[in-house]
A protein has these predicted regions:
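Radical SAM [4Fe-4S] cluster-binding motif and immediate context
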Residues: 155-323, 330, 334-343, 371, ...
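Radical SAM enzyme core and accessory elements
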Residues: 2-8, 50, 65, 386-586
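Acidic/polar loop patches that form or flank catalytic/metal-binding clefts of enzymes
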Residues: 140-143, 219, 252, 323, ...
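Flexible glycine/acidic-rich beta-alpha junction loops that bind and position SAM and/or redox cofactors
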Residues: 13-20, 107-110, 230-231, 289-295, ...
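Acidic, low-complexity intrinsically disordered segments
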Residues: 2-215, 407
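Structural recognition of alpha->loop->beta junctions
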Residues: 110-129, 270-278, 342-355
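A structural motif corresponding to the C-terminal end of an alpha-helix
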Residues: 41-52, 213-214, 274, 310-322, ...
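Conserved beta-strand positions
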Residues: 8, 74, 221-223, 281, ...
Length: 586
């Protein structure tokens, strides 16, 4: 039997709030999470394939990797689109067939060039068929599943293909799908509204596998909504409580859940006993009318106008740190919404509040409504930090983007005063007394040391005064939460760095746009004083542009390339009209 080589490639993610790149530097990690989709796909290959996985967030793709491969398989989300294009170009140049799957190709496959085979949606049924067709020379360009697969047959992910130490957290998946149908969300379009779950035996085998491979610490259950099927979630939790206890609580768990979790006492208590210490909740906005308009009705209660705030405090009282997702730019948003977001985030004590501008994803109800209303501008980059909107908002765009930057620079201010104030309020709200004893301080010794070293650097920065005050308060009143505060501080450092770059990128693009608009008039005005005056103006402008460009972190420069090229082309055209040459390239 001739062995075939399959190269599984996970393209790069753009640096964002969720990448935690600047926190990972402290931890000695290369990426926050492994590519669970590709690790699961790897288990579907027959034995006559030799596999190699390249996570480009951990190491670069090399020419040797491509020479080794007989088949290249990729999996991407929309935010990885640009990196995927580079991967496909290199693979085709090397003469290798390319397979593309994941949420991005599922929605946008018609826009992706040079890919030989697309596997859309969930591939448990279609991937084995594709491999058989490939072997027989009858492989099709497009494979679309006829129905949602039961995931009770999904095999164990191939964690042995990665170095676990490269990552700050491991991933597992218990369910797919969500019973809700928010207008802006594509989850139900991709995975359906009837959550499908794995068996207890499957899940405990996955926990056991990671345990046997030596993993200890953070483990994220990446379900779209962990409590989408409450009965099955409770069934798993009861088994997981026993497993964690028998293994001395090796994992501290995190997941995503809808806000109505607070209405199910038994579920919350079981999650705490199973070792869940944090939960991500899609809050979106504190405005009930906007929530109803976008079909996020699970966040609204007619008899409680402050239901989201009360829900977050209830979760914290159970021992969960709540991470919140927020959206600006929803229909119905007014200029008052920015202060409402800031006020809510501070009152709710959500240190990690992931604020983003509304993104219209293809295939969502929002997409089709915007299409009917003639408000679509094109495809999204998938990065909710991008201030380039792919739709026409109701609010004036200048007001929206300026308000967005103000929100970010308030909740993640220069000295992180507001951030650390939220951390302190969280410590006051957080009740870990119900958690199993080992989970009351869930960090492990190596993490503690790294976070402590990171703290020393932060204490010497502009964030030092507010951080020092927080440390004094916590040591005095909540010493059991000290290591958790170290972790939050390191994450706050990352969130502030991202905020600085988002602000710098947007300000720089706006500066270039203004300069392009003013170029002709300014050069014409200076022409009255001769070419020497024009050259002085051009020299000063280019020097300023070069300085601002270099001040932007290299991971964010791709956001300004179009604006930079437009400016340089406009400048070159204006100078050429006067028979003057461009200044030295930057």
């Amino acid at each position: 039997m001739n062995k075939k080589n399959a190269l599984l490639i996970y393209p790069e993610f753009a640096t964002s709030f969720w990448s935690f790149k600047f926190t990972l530097q402290y931890l000695g990690k290369k990426s926050s999470m492994p590519p669970l989709g590709l690790l699961t796909l790897a288990s579907l290959f027959p034995e006559d394939y030799t596999l190699r996985l390249v996570d480009m967030n951990v190491r670069p793709l090399t020419d040797d990797d491509l020479r080794w491969a007989d088949l290249v398989c990729t999996s991407t989300m929309i935010v990885q689109r640009q990196s995927l294009e580079h991967v496909v170009t290199r693979a085709k140049r090397a003469g290798k067939p390319v397979v593309a799957g994941g949420p991005h190709p599922t929605s946008y496959w018609e826009d992706i060039a040079d890919v030989d085979y697309f596997l859309l949606g969930e591939v448990e049924a279609t991937f084995p068929r594709f491999l058989r067709d490939l072997e027989q020379g009858t492989a099709q360009h497009l494979y679309v599943p006829q129905e949602k697969p039961a995931i009770t047959q999904t095999p164990l992910p191939r964690y042995d293909l990665i170095n676990l130490r490269d990552y700050s957290s491991m991933l597992l998946q218990f369910s797919r799908g969500c019973p809700f149908d928010c207008e802006f969300c594509d989850i139900t379009k991709l995975y359906g509204r009837v959550p499908r779950t794995k068996t207890n035996e499957q899940m405990l085998a996955e926990f056991e596998l990671l345990y046997d491979l030596g993993w200890r610490g953070a483990l994220f259950l990446v379900d779209d909504n962990f409590i989408g099927n409450r009965r099955d979630a409770l069934r798993l939790l009861r088994a997981l409580i026993a497993w964690q206890r028998d293994h001395h609580y090796p994992f501290n768990l995190c997941t995503e859940a809808s806000m109505n979790l607070v209405e199910y006492e038994e579920l919350m208590d079981a999650m705490v006993q199973a070792g869940f210490t944090s939960v991500f909740v899609g809050i979106e906005t504190p405005t009930p009318a906007a929530l109803i308009a976008t079909k996020k009705k699970q966040n609204v209660r007619q008899n409680d106008p402050e239901y989201p705030l009360h829900a977050i405090h209830t979760l914290q009282g159970k021992g969960f740190e709540v991470m919140g997702g927020f959206i600006l730019g929803l229909d119905g948003d007014t200029p008052e919404v920015f202060d409402l977001h800031i006020q809510f985030i501070q009152q709710a004590a959500i240190p990690m509040a992931m604020e983003g501008l509304l993104t219209v994803l293809k295939g969502t109800d929002l997409y089709y409504r915007m299409e009917r209303e003639g408000r679509l501008r094109g495809d999204t980059t998938g990065n909710n930090l991008d201030t380039l909107l792919n739709f026409v908002p109701e609010m004036p765009e200048e007001t929206l983007t300026a308000g967005y930057k103000r929100v970010l620079n308030t909740i993640y201010d220069h000295g992180l005063k507001n951030y650390f104030e939220r951390c302190w309020t969280l410590c006051q709200n957080l009740d870990r007394s119900r958690a199993p004893k080992p989970m009351q301080t869930p960090l492990r010794s190596p993490e503690m040391l790294r976070f402590a070293l990171a703290s020393m650097k932060q204490l010497m920065s502009a964030q030092g005064p507010a951080y020092l005050q927080l440390l004094h308060r916590v040591i005095t009143h909540y010493p059991n939460l000290l290591w958790e505060v170290f972790a939050l501080a390191a994450k706050g450092y990352h969130l502030r760095k991202i905020t600085e770059q988002v602000t710098a990128v947007d300000n720089f693009k706006r500066y270039l746009t203004r300069e392009v608009d003013n170029l002709q008039a300014e050069i014409a005005r200076r022409a009255q004083d001769g070419n020497k005056s024009i050259r002085a103006y051009v020299r000063d402008v280019v020097a300023h542009v070069r300085k601002e460009y270099r001040a932007i972190h290299k991971d964010f420069r791709h956001h300004i390339e179009d604006a930079r090229k437009t400016f340089m082309n406009a400048l070159g055209t204006s100078l050429k009209e006067r028979h003057l040459s461009m200044p030295m390239r930057w």
